[in-house]
Amino acid sequence: MLHAAQIAGAGSPYVVVIGNEKGGSGKTTLAMHLAVALLKEGQRVGTIDLDSNQRGLTRYIENRRIWANHRRIELEMPLHHLVLRAEGAKLRDNEAKELAAFEGIISGIRKSVDFLVIDTPSTDAYLMRLAHLVADTVLTPVTDSFLDLGTLASVDPVTHEVTGTGHYAEMVCEARMRRRQFDQGHIDWIVIRNRSARGQLVGHSITELGIRLGLRDVEGCAERIVYRQFFPSGLTALDALDEATFGAIPGQSHRLAQQEMRILIGFLNLPIGERGRRRAAARKEWYASAQAPLEIDKVLID
């Protein structure tokens, strides 16, 4: 069986883990948008949902499949898997089962995908730590709130200076250290701050934390209701902004969401290959020709 430490080895997909112990930070929304963005770039994408209780990413993808069939449209779909949490009486047995399930999925798809996007639960669990250990990039979305920042750092209430490292940040640092030990790999950790009008002080604290821990701090998306409206239909801000796709004419909020999401994905600097871009261009050309009406000389027969 493939050992977990080999998942990130040569010939394996580039692994992006979406993680934060704070619920409601937008992990699943980010995971879905990233997967669709990579698919639109012609990359072969696998997704794994490690939150077997909420199953947010699993339901998001299933909604997308149902919506595409209902609207009779083509929507990019990742190769998706759900890892169930073991519920036995013995912790060691549970971890062995979860490791086997995780490794089994990776073994089955590692040669079929270029990227693997993993959505994690908002709890410190074995699967959560395992995913971070094999990550090439960790994305941590946070809202502009000192309450949400608590999983990353403790902050002085007067000066807003960082005074300590939070539990989740310690877990990521441990994963980075262990990763260096077994394959000299580097985990690129990016904290994505979702923007609000009140978040300037939070931004300063995250920047200070970045200097301490060697993480990248990028500005994310605004808090828009439209992101929550995407879930029932499985759509994203990166899908075609037309009535055929959405079932209604998209508004200005859709266009703004698309623009800011494209900017965010660009900031991540993921290794998107030229081969994938050529694949995306060919797919786009094929789809355009399939939708175009036939020329009259191709219809009439002498």
Where are these regions (language model features)?
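Hydrophobic positions on the alpha1 helix immediately C-terminal to the Walker A/P-loop
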Residues: L30
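Short aromatic-enriched loop/helix-cap "lid" or pocket-rim segments at secondary-structure transitions
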Residues: T58-I61, T151-S154, G203-H204, F230-G234
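P-loop/Walker-type NTP enzyme "switch/lid" segment
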Residues: V15, G19-S25, A37-L116, S122, ...
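Generic structural signal for helix capping and beta-alpha/helix-loop junctions
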Residues: R55, L147-L149, R228
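Conserved catalytic-core segment of NTP-binding enzymes
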Residues: E41, I118-E219
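Active-site signature of alpha/beta-hydrolase-fold catalytic machinery across serine-
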Residues: H33, A37, L130
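C-terminal lobe/tail of nucleotide-utilizing enzymes
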Residues: M1-A10, R180-D302
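Short, hinge-like loop/turn segments at secondary-structure boundaries
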Residues: N63-W67, P157-T159, T236-L238
